[in-house]
């Protein structure tokens, strides 16, 4: 596809009402919306969750920091990359640095922002702010304060691919991050140095 994408009209929000709220973790809204063709949808539901940062972190010798932890939403143990939600007033990069330290005890020498991606376009959900951190080194003990127990693993890229093929990554965001960073073209062209 070249040139400008085709134009699509935006839906007009006529009314919004809160259905459920559990701040800061979850808000469900019902919207009345007018479609470009004139139809009106009386109950379009939106779910809002907090934005988060997720990091693909490589040590100086090229191993990747991976967490093995129970994820109650899927009721299973999964491999994940370090990640976490924003604190009030925090920007994406500050969140990424804080979460890396809290969950692993590591800091990174170099950072690249890989962009902001919405996790569920039809319901909004939240946005994932992705980062590639390199030259990571351990400077402290992990102290995340999270509900989940975490086991920190140092894996090669080949081990990550094998784990993904075996279904050890339960979340699409993790597979997307792995593909984005390791793709021979995208991995070198997406993002900017922070």
Which residues are covered by each model-predicted region?
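Short aromatic/basic micro-patch
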Residues: 80, 130, 154
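A short coil-to-beta-strand element that immediately follows conserved catalytic motifs
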Residues: 107-114
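Conserved Nudix-box catalytic region and its N-terminal flanking loop in Nudix hydrolases
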Residues: 8-11, 47-49, 53-98, 146
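Acidic, metal-coordinating catalytic segment for phosphate/diphosphate chemistry
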Residues: 17-54, 60
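Nudix hydrolase/Nudix homology domain
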Residues: 2-13, 77, 88, 122-123, ...
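Short loop segments at secondary-structure junctions
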Residues: 36-38, 59-61, 70, 133-138, ...
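Acidic pyrophosphate-coordinating catalytic loop
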Residues: 18-24, 117-129, 186
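Active-site-adjacent beta-strand/loop module that shapes the phosphate/pyrophosphate-binding cleft
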Residues: 29-35, 120-140
């Amino acid at each position: 596809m070249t040139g400008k994408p085709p134009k699509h009209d935006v839906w007009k929000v006529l009314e919004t009402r809160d259905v459920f709220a559990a701040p800061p973790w979850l808000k469900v809204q019902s919207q009345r919306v007018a479609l470009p063709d004139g139809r009106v949808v009386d109950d379009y539901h939106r779910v809002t969750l907090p934005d988060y940062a997720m990091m693909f972190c490589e040590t100086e010798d090229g191993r990747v920091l991976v967490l093995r932890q129970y994820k109650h939403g899927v009721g299973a143990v999964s491999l994940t990359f370090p990640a976490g939600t924003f604190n009030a007033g925090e920007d994406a990069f500050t969140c990424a640095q804080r979460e890396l330290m809290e969950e692993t005890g590591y800091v990174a020498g170099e950072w690249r922002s890989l962009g902001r991606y919405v996790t569920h376009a039809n319901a909004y959900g939240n946005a994932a702010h992705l980062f590639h951190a390199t030259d990571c080194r351990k400077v402290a003990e992990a102290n995340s304060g999270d509900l989940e127990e975490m086991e920190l693993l140092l894996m090669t890229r080949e081990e990550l691919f094998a784990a993904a093929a075996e279904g050890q990554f339960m979340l699409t965001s993790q597979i997307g991050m792995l593909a984005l960073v390791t793709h021979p073209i995208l991995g070198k062209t997406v993002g900017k140095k922070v």
